[in-house]
Amino acid sequence: MALYLILVLMLFGSTLVFYSLSPYYSALGLVVVSISGCIILSFLGGSFVALVLVLVYMGGMLVVFAYSSAISAERFPSVNNLGEVIGLSVLFSSWVFLSFDNFQDFSNSFSCFISGESLVEAGFYMKGFLVLVGVFVLLVVLVGALIISRGIENTVIRAI
């Protein structure tokens, strides 16, 4: 049941990212999604990998958030249709809750698939390729955030 609640929290964070007009609430949604994803990884046995991922992801997201909030800072940040965000989260979580019969069988079936040592060993086996892929993905996200926030008419930098 705890795994289900963490998945609902991840769903709420992702809908907050999709429906927010301001980068402040999008960053909050990304924090919720990343922390809940790392909690799911630690439930499945990868506690070290979860800790490393949350530290790396929060650092990369901090850079993207700093650039996007500097370009498109708003005086009154808002979420577009907050009731719709909460409604979608309640709808999907109740749909999943009613479709599963027993959550105990679901949580016991994934008990030994992921171990932190095997994922770290795979990272060393790839000889830094995964680090380069992560750097490239963060760079693409940064450029995407800058392109999206460039089209806004009334921003702080353009008002100067």
UniProtKB/Swiss-Prot annotation:
Similarity remark: Belongs to the complex I subunit 6 family.
EC number(s) given by UniProt: 7.1.1.2
PANTHER family: NADH UBIQUINONE OXIDOREDUCTASE SUBUNIT ND6, NADH-UBIQUINONE OXIDOREDUCTASE CHAIN 6
Pfam families given in the database record: Oxidored_q3
Name the record gives this protein: NADH-ubiquinone oxidoreductase chain 6
Subcellular location: Mitochondrion membrane
Membrane-spanning parts: 1-21, 39-59, 83-103, 128-148
Main location: mitochondrion
Disulfide bond annotation, renumbered to this chain: none
Alphabetically ordered keywords of this record: Electron transport, Membrane, Mitochondrion, NAD, Respiratory chain, Translocase, Transmembrane, Transmembrane helix, Transport, Ubiquinone
Membrane topology category: Multi-pass membrane protein
InterPro entries: ComplexI_Subunit6 (IPR050269), NADH_UbQ/plastoQ_OxRdtase_su6 (IPR001457), Nuo/plastoQ_OxRdtase_6_NuoJ (IPR042106)
Gene Ontology cellular component list: mitochondrial membrane
GO molecular function annotation: NADH dehydrogenase (ubiquinone) activity
Keyword Zinc among UniProt keywords: no
Catalytic activity: a ubiquinone + NADH + 5 H(+)(in) = a ubiquinol + NAD(+) + 4 H(+)(out)
Gene3D superfamilies linked: NADH-ubiquinone/plastoquinone oxidoreductase chain 6, subunit NuoJ (1.20.120.1200)
This protein's record includes keyword Transport: yes
Purpose of the protein: Core subunit of the mitochondrial membrane respiratory chain NADH dehydrogenase (Complex I) that is believed to belong to the minimal assembly required for catalysis. Complex I functions in the transfer of electrons from NADH to the respiratory chain. The immediate electron acceptor for the enzyme is believed to be ubiquinone.
Source organism superkingdom: Eukaryota
Top enzyme category: translocase
